[in-house]
Amino acid sequence: MKTALFTLLSVLLSGSALATPYKVDMGHSAVLFKVKHFNVGYTFGSFKSFKGSFEEGASVELTVDASSVDSNVEKRDSHLKGPDFFNVKQFPEITFKGSKWEGDTVTGALSFHGVTKEVSLKVEKVGAGADPWGNQRVGYYGELTIKRSDFGVSYGVKEGSASDELTLIISLEGVQKKG
């Protein structure tokens, strides 16, 4: 299946001259989602393949391969990749291009399923420090709830099989290689 890219964050701020670039450590990061199922429980999923980088307090770029979606049910994963949900053949990329990171809020344009909307992501700095190899690391966590129907994805909403609200859960650990 054609690779679909999910660029979740690309944030530019003033004062970035002192920003330090970090590469997202995929082995210690996660991009997850949850959606209510029949309004009685949640269905969770994740994306197994992504890459990115960020300059703390300045910019972030995250690209997620949407075809790597994994909900622990192969048949459902095939449906998620199809036209009712991600439609990876027609809309190969989902992007977020931020324009502002103030305090604990990152704001920018989320483009998904051919629609672009401004959204705000509340982030928490989890921690920062050196690893045993002398590299600097920093971690951020955030959740963003969107309405799927705002992006033209409304399969199951009317019937109640899948809620309109979808929450993205993003946990990124960045590493700055020494030297």
Q: What spans do the regions from the language model cover?
A:
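Positively charged n-region of N-terminal signal peptides that target proteins for export
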Residues: 1-4
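N-terminal signal peptide c-region/cleavage motif recognized by signal peptidases
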Residues: 14-16
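Low-complexity, acidic/polar, glycine-enriched regions of mature
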Residues: 18-179
